[in-house]
């Protein structure tokens, strides 16, 4: 429970306030640490949520927002109570594997947060229940293409409600880089020119260290060429033509960013988006590849006259006519229960709390085009850019071998950036190890 601080007040006041909002036992309260709805409600559903998407969120505005939404939902559905299991934010990734196993043995919660990345695995296992009937055709058609692709099974049915997403973009200081680079060559040229204008800045920063962001962010360079990581069976194919050439092009481009001086070699150690924000605040970077989610904190942390210098554009590509792909992630809600009433309630909760309202609370991007028009949070012109970028969104392949593919690509990028391996050597090693992992999984 979040601590309530009431200055110049006695303990009784604090207890009273907590009692009003969270309940003090019995059936009176509609919201507690682990329950939404009255304790004596006749119908019960188990609900598993990430901590960030609850009234226990670390961000105060998020906690307050979800407290309001949970309370309203409980009041609107007096016959239902949700027994909450809250997953700590630093365990959400690991929890997906546990959730998949729980579903396999019939012990999954009735309703839960499911990472968009692993939804295809849940569908393939038969863990998720179809939810088509709770969404109109118009609502389903309004989803961005990458969203529909992920949540739709081979049978054409919709199996999860993907409600929040993000994307990767290029941030640049317009006093140093007046025009947005369209190609890799222009990116390197403009980065070097910026360093000539101001010797204190790095021309271009990006994730190059050992973490998922390095693979995911830079896959845009691979996808924009038409690259595929795996085939329809989930087997790695990024080392086979034409994908091999596309991946070599990506690795050679990243190598050139360092070799040319456009990027410092220390990009091989960057594994946190916060480094880009810190560099922007210090005035030591001209361009960086980051996420849409960095726009609000940059706006808040930079003086207005400095923030005005920054603009956002799409990720440059190898050729000027290549589509400007971008990696997209985010969270869904899935229904696991065999009880149709609980599946229905799961989707009612999702639509009342997360779709639209949850985007308003968190600022995370909607997955439906129309919500960009409807929600006040996204009226600022920059969200038109994000909305347009999502049309070229790409989700990671939701196959069991992807984590090892990502790990191997991280290693490959790192060894190329530091000069330990040539792009060819790094790719061959990454592909060999990814295939071995896939073959081991097939046993």
Show the residue positions of the predicted features:
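Conserved N-terminal structural module of periplasmic/extracytoplasmic solute-binding proteins
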Residues: 2-10, 21-120, 425, 429, ...
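Hinge/lid segment of periplasmic solute-binding proteins
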Residues: 32, 116-167, 185-190, 198, ...
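A structural signal for short loop-to-beta-strand junctions that line the ligand-binding cleft
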Residues: 109-110, 139-175, 321-325, 392-399
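Short, solvent-exposed loop/beta-turn-alpha elements that line the ligand-binding surface or hinge
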Residues: 133-143, 204-211, 225-249, 300-305, ...
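Extracytoplasmic/periplasmic solute-binding protein
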Residues: 157-164, 168, 188-239, 243, ...
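Extracytoplasmic/periplasmic substrate-recognition and gating elements
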Residues: 178, 256, 260-263, 300-365, ...
